Regions:
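Non-catalytic structural scaffold of enzyme domains
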Residues: 2-287
Length: 287
């Protein structure tokens, strides 16, 4: 078993992998988009599932966790970091950007594309409480909302439910209906999925709303932004380099990450989790 201590050993910085971090499993939706748009790149994914959801945590905790995991990834040679968590981006990316020497890409609720998509000029935003209360979110509303009214709905309970692997149970559908029906009653025709976990609810939302809401998911936009950042810093992988399978790490036992990654990443991709951590709270995959 090789050591995971340095992803970039014996290779150029450009050939090193990109780090991806989320509070849990939601960032796998971003990883899927990144692999589709940048198939030659390699990726290292960290799910902080032991501490999910971040949306109910205070700002200091979110900053501490994001910085700790970002430093862990940077120290092991990742060439860039995608903070694939709306809550972590909203509350901590400015601090983390100052501390880390590698380029960062964050995720934000798709307020601008929702404004462009909405014909009724009423749109819903489903996000964590921490995202909705953040100054970064308010800035997006001020910059892009224009004449469009945004209905803000904290998605209490959704991340925990998705982390358990539930995306369509009767209880989940009832919870979602309670969030979505007031939006429809208010005339919303567009819904911003303001958490990277929520794209896993895409089909259930469409069924509950009879496809009356245009869903805004920013995963593909994140992939385009990462491509631009790698270009700007001369960090695109050298031509002819074969992408390696993603390395996946979890702060819980990794079983849910393994199951969901195998289903989402396709091609028979398998995640193996080693139960013996080499540092506090970390469970590492076999390599």
């Amino acid at each position: 078993m090789s050591s995971p201590s340095d992803f970039a050993s014996e290779e150029s910085t450009a050939a090193a992998p990109v780090g991806i971090f989320d509070s849990g499993l939601g960032g796998l939706s971003v990883l899927r988009a990144l692999r589709a748009q940048l198939p030659e790149e390699s990726f290292v994914y960290v799910a902080d599932s032991r501490h999910a959801p971040y949306g109910e945590r205070d700002d200091a905790f979110i900053i501490e966790r994001t910085l700790a995991i970002g430093e862990w990834l940077a120290a092991r040679g990742t060439k860039a970091l995608v903070v694939a968590c709306n809550t972590a981006t909203a509350q901590s990316i400015a601090v983390v950007r100052e501390k880390l020497a590698i380029p960062l890409v964050g995720v934000e609720p798709g307020i601008k594309p929702a404004t462009l998509a909405s014909r009724s000029r009423v749109a819903g935003v489903l996000a964590t409480a921490a995202t909705l209360r953040s100054a970064r979110f308010e800035s997006l509303i001020e910059r892009y909302a224009a004449d469009c009214r945004f209905l803000r709905q904290p998605g209490h309970g959704l991340v925990e439910t998705i982390e358990r692997g539930d995306t369509s149970s009767p209880a989940l559908r009832a919870l979602l209906a309670g969030y979505l029906e007031p939006m429809l009653a208010a005339g919303a025709d567009t819904l911003v999925l303001g958490c990277t976990h929520y794209p896993f609810l895409d089909m259930t939302i469409r069924e509950l709303t009879q496809a009356r809401l245009t869903l805004i998911d920013t995963s593909e936009a994140i992939a385009r932004q990462l491509a631009r950042v790698l270009d700007e810093h001369g960090l695109h992988v050298p031509t002819g380099t074969a992408a390696r399978p993603p390395h996946l790490y979890s702060t819980d036992d990794g079983s849910r990450l393994q199951a969901l990654a195998a289903a989402l990443l396709g091609g028979g991709f398998k995640v193996e989790v080693q139960q013996k951590p080499v540092a506090p709270e970390w469970h590492l995959p076999r390599q």
